[in-house]
Structures are given as C-alpha cells and as structure tokens.
Amino acid sequence: MDRLAESFAAGGIDSTLDALGQYFKSEKKYHELFEILKMKVRRKLGLPIVYDENAIELDEKVRNQLEDGLLEACKEAGTGLLRDGKIREGWMYLRPLGDRSGVESLVREIPADESNLDELIEVCVSEGVAPGYGFSLVLEHYGTCNSITAYETQISHLPRADQENAAEQLVSHLHAELSKNLKDVISQQEGQAPSEISIKGLVEDRDWLFGELTYHIDTTHLASVVRFARVVQTESCLRLALDLTEYGRRLHSQFQYQGEEPFADVYPSSALYFQALLGENIDAAIHYFKEKAEATDAYHQGTASIEVYIDLLTRCDRTQEAIEASIAMLPAGTRTVGLAPTLYELSRRVGDFSRMMEVCRKNEDVLGFATALMQKNA
C-alpha cells in the first residue's frame, strides 16, 4: 500500500494504474487486472475511471473506442486465465471477442488431466469453441458409451461439419476396436493371426463367429455409430462405415435393432446408402430411397425419408433431381428436420433460381420469390 501511495505521489493516476497493472499481471490476478485495464481505457478517453450510471451519454465515436478498449482488456485477462489453466473463467472474458479459432489454439495448449478435463470438454463442446477436440477428449477419457451420449445430446445439434468430425472419430474408433476383437477371436480359434485386413474379409466364410448369443462389440454402440456415419463425407471413413455394416448384417436377429425409416432395416439400408456415396450401386440406392420417400405421408409420418432421399441425390451430384424432388415431395409450409438442403440451397448450388421463383410465385411466397429474384440477378 505504501508503494502505491509513493507511486501516486510521484506520477499520479497514470503511474498508479501502470504499477497496479504490472502487479496484478505478475501475481496472475487476472480479474483484478481486467478492472485496472478498464480504468486505463476510460481514462485514456477522458472518462471517469469508474463507471457512473448518471454520466452523460457517450457519442458514437467515443462509445466505439470504449468498446474496442474493453474487448482488448477482455482478451488480455481471458488469455492470461486460460494460460493459467482457469478455463471457464478465461472463456468468460474471451466469449465477447467471437474469436473461437484463437481460443481453440489456446485451449489446445492446455494439457488435459483429471483436474481440468470436464472444464475443457464443457468449453470445447457445450460452448462450441472446439467441438472436434472436445469430443476427442470425451472419447479418449470416457469411452464409447459416453461419447455416443455426447453425440446424441450435444454434437447432433451443432453444424454439419462438427457432426462429421465427431462421427468420423467414432467410426474409426469403433472399427479399430471391432477389428481387434475379431482378430483376437480368430487367432485363438484358428491358431494363427488372420491375413485379412477388412472386417468384411474377417467375417466372410467364418459363420462360426455369429451364434445366437455371440457378438464382439456392444451391438447398441454399433447401431448408433452406423447411424451417425451417414453424415460422413470422406471416402476412407465411408469405407470403414460400410465395413461395419458387413458385420452388423451378419448378427443374430435379436441384435438386428429396428431403425427409423428410411433405415428401418439398419445395416442393409445403411450399406446401400454408403455405397452410393462411394459411387457404387448409385441407381439401386436412389431407387430404394425414392420408394421410401414416395411411401411417406409428410404430414403424418414426418419428412425424414423424403429429406434423406433429397440429400442423397444432392450428395450423388444429382442436384437438379433433388430440386424437383424437393418441390414435389415437400409442400409449402412443411416442417422439416434439417436433413436435406433447402430449395434455396439447392438452387444456389446449381446457380439457377428459376424453379424456386416459379414455386414461390405459385405459393404466393413473396419473401421467397424476392430472395430468388435478387439471387438470380446478383
């Protein structure tokens, strides 16, 4: 306190604020540092160093400068807290900046351990800072079951790219686990390690692997991961997902769980879907999912089957067909579940908004028509 008084006597307010800033920074007292940084910003702008609710309203220029200065203060305090391992507190300051990639870089520098694991996962997944990294921590430290729950309750509500990242991790993890389990059983039974690499190769001509009570991985996990895999884009991971269906379809009937349309018969229908995305059996897959879509009453059964069909057409580079299917099968005002691109997104993909304009005119959708008109002439 005496040193502060001496600092104030020697240099006034500015000297005191500088000294306090250095002190709190050296002591890693970042909440207090933030308060000092706020005072410095306000003093620089000629404002009282402590906010007064009765103060006059600021003009736009000063208000913008104040906001910029406060954001810089948030950045310094939040970065310090993160580097000190105080993850939730650091994120509290860094959230207003909107710089998620910068925060992700900082978070990845923090070694994960028992003391901070839950905080890391919360900020990365729940707060959306780095969902892929956070999900990898869940998978590594809490296992498959908890990862599936996290995917269902949190990841599935995030943007498609984040879903893909997490789904790829789960597919790779489960495929590796199942492959190892199968190889161990085969080696024990046959007296030597199998030469086959893929799951399909391991299970073909080995019917003895599949008895009434026999399985080599949690079958509920398998069904869930195959379902999640439908968002996957990369060829290598799609092939792993297809490989998982080769095992699943050979399981005893009691482990063949009923799925939701259009994947009621989970493994055969999923296999057909993955094959189409890999450029195989495209016509057969499109025919199958078209029949499922056409058999659906959107008002009473929901739109999932229709959306899966539209999305499959799009992913198989049949976007014009997807546009026509969307127009024909999803009447105006239909509530969708977000599995397929919208008519606007499909039109933008092909660079042609003519059909969208026609439909919007017919349905007296003024906003949709105007949007398509402006995009067409942009």
At which residue positions do the language-model features occur?
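Long, low-complexity, acidic Ser/Pro- and Gly-enriched intrinsically disordered regions
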Residues: 1-95, 102, 107-378
